[in-house]
Amino acid sequence: MALYEHVMIARQDLSNAQAEALNEHFGAVLADNGGTVVDTEYWGVKTMAYKINKNRKGHYSYLRTDAPSDAVQEMERLMRLHDDVMRVLTIKVDAHDEGPSVQMQKRDEREGRRERR
C-alpha cells in the first residue's frame, strides 16, 4: 500500500466537533476500502489567502494514511461531493515524517528560520 498525506478545508460555520467528525467519517471510508489512517491533526480555523465559495476562513485538517489507490480515490470522491468540504489536497509520499507536522510545531522549534531584523 502507498503512503499519502491529505489536507482538507471545511466550511467556517462548522463547530470544532463537526470538523473533527469529518476526519473520523472519511477515516472510516478509508478503512472500509482497505486503508488505515496513521495520524490526524486538526489545525483549527485559519484565514485563507482568497475566498473559496464565499468563505474567508476554514477548518483545516491533516491526515496521514496508508491505503491502496482505490480507497484514496473513493475517499477523495466523497470529500468532493460533501457539502461541508471546500478543498482537498492529496499528496503521495515515500515516508511519513515522525512527530507533528510543521503547522503544529511552535515557531521557535522550526528549523531553518533566521533571526528577524
From Swiss-Prot:
Keywords attached to this entry: Ribonucleoprotein, Ribosomal protein, RNA-binding, rRNA-binding
The name this protein goes by in its record: Small ribosomal subunit protein bS6
Superkingdom, natural source: Bacteria
GO molecular function: small ribosomal subunit rRNA binding; structural constituent of ribosome
Kinase keyword on record: no
Single GO cellular component term: cytosolic small ribosomal subunit
Family note: Belongs to the bacterial ribosomal protein bS6 family.
Residues covered by region (Disordered): 96-117
A Gene Ontology biological process term: translation
Keyword Calcium in annotation: no
Family annotation (SUPFAM superfamilies): Ribosomal protein S6
Pfam families xref list: Ribosomal_S6 (PF01250)
Biological source species: Jannaschia sp. (strain CCS1)
Function of the protein: Binds together with bS18 to 16S ribosomal RNA.
